[in-house]
């Protein structure tokens, strides 16, 4: 992995009681040893693989102001990280669920892009076997389940300050929503809405095939084509490129997909991240509620599965063998 650490700082927040978080600050930066580089590379890998929300700094963001000064050489990285950790402690102290942890600030370069990654990591206990085959306790950083993480694309921020996507963050677990405190600490608000972009794409594709007067099978083939392209981009860690997608759909209509989307005003970005759950709707219908869960391929609608909107009734012709077997055993047993 072509990852180069520029500067990295680590501090700690310790929860002593319900009201107090103790601040433990390092007096020096971490040395980018092989172990440190491996840790950052793993954190980068794990973070990059997760679904993220996008944001941008507000004009009043204290973190953005001090980061800009640090980038201009008016403040060193250690001082910047120490002051920022203090502000994070003040934000966390407002919430009873605050657990503390290790606060990491890492300025690194990956594939010619500079990043600042900010994360709160937990220390977990486990067991290890030593050279004498004895079992001893050990501790490790829980990188795989880190959910208080944000990353600033410094290159994008400094070259395109009007961007709505230079800051990414994880939304966190239920009850520990990053928006409740981490976004306040960052002085940021949500920017590019990835789900909205993907929903807009799905609507544009449906309208595009309808205007082209395709039959049902042709429409589903186009949806499958779009899904295949988007899924390939997702698996490769790349964004959906409208121009590339439009080329994939050449021949569907006399008008290109990009021209159609622009003319109809779907407000799609030239490129945006793929959202797996939204894109799945191109090829499947799924829903749950009231003790019922249904999931089926879109091509079955109108063939083996029929929906009557007036009565909100779904009729299934030909049930799966394992389901049919369960139904037969239950009904024959009189239960």
Curated annotation (Swiss-Prot):
Cystine pairings recorded for this chain: none
Molecular function via GO: double-stranded DNA binding; single-stranded RNA binding
Keyword Cytoplasm part of the UniProt annotation: yes
Keyword annotations: Cytoplasm
GO-annotated cellular components: bacterial nucleoid; cytoplasm
Annotated Pfam families: NA37
InterPro entries: Nucleoid_associated_NdpA (IPR007358)
PANTHER family according to UniProt: NUCLEOID-ASSOCIATED PROTEIN YEJK, PTHR38772
Family membership: Belongs to the YejK family.
Designated name of the protein: Nucleoid-associated protein YejK
Organism this protein belongs to: Shigella sonnei (strain Ss046)
Organism lineage string: Bacteria, Pseudomonadati, Pseudomonadota, Gammaproteobacteria, Enterobacterales
């Amino acid at each position: 992995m072509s990852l180069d650490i520029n500067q990295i700082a680590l501090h700690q927040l310790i929860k002593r009681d319900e009201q107090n978080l103790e601040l433990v600050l390092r007096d020096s930066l971490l040395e980018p040893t092989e172990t440190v580089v491996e840790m950052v590379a793993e954190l980068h890998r794990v973070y990059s693989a997760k679904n993220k929300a996008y944001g941008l700094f507000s004009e009043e963001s204290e973190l953005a102001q001090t980061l800009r000064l640090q980038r201009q050489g008016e403040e060193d990285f250690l001082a910047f990280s120490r002051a920022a950790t203090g502000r994070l402690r003040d934000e966390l102290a407002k919430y009873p669920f605050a657990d503390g942890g290790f606060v990491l600030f890492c300025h690194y370069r990956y594939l010619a892009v500079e990043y600042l990654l900010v994360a709160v990591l937990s220390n977990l206990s486990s067991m290890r076997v030593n050279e004498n085959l004895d079992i001893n306790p050990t501790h490790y950083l829980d990188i795989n389940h880190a959910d208080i993480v944000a990353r600033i694309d410094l290159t994008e921020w400094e070259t395109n300050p009007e961007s709505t996507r230079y800051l990414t963050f994880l939304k966190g677990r239920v009850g520990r929503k990053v928006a409740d405190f981490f976004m306040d600490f960052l002085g940021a608000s949500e920017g590019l809405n990835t789900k909205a972009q993907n929903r807009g794409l799905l609507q544009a594709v449906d309208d595009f095939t309808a205007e082209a007067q395709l039959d049902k099978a042709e429409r589903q083939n186009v949806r499958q084509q779009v899904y295949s392209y988007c899924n390939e981009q997702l698996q490769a860690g790349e964004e959906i490129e409208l121009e590339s997608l439009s080329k994939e759909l050449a021949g569907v209509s006399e008008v290109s997909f990009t021209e159609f989307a622009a003319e109809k005003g779907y407000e799609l970005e030239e490129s945006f991240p793929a959202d797996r759950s939204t894109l799945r709707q191109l090829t499947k219908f799924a829903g749950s509620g009231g003790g019922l869960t249904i999931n089926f391929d879109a091509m079955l609608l109108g063939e083996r599965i029929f929906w009557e909107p007036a009565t909100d009734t779904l009729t299934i012709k030909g049930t799966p063998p394992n389901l049919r077997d369960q139904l037969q055993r239950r009904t024959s047993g009189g239960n």
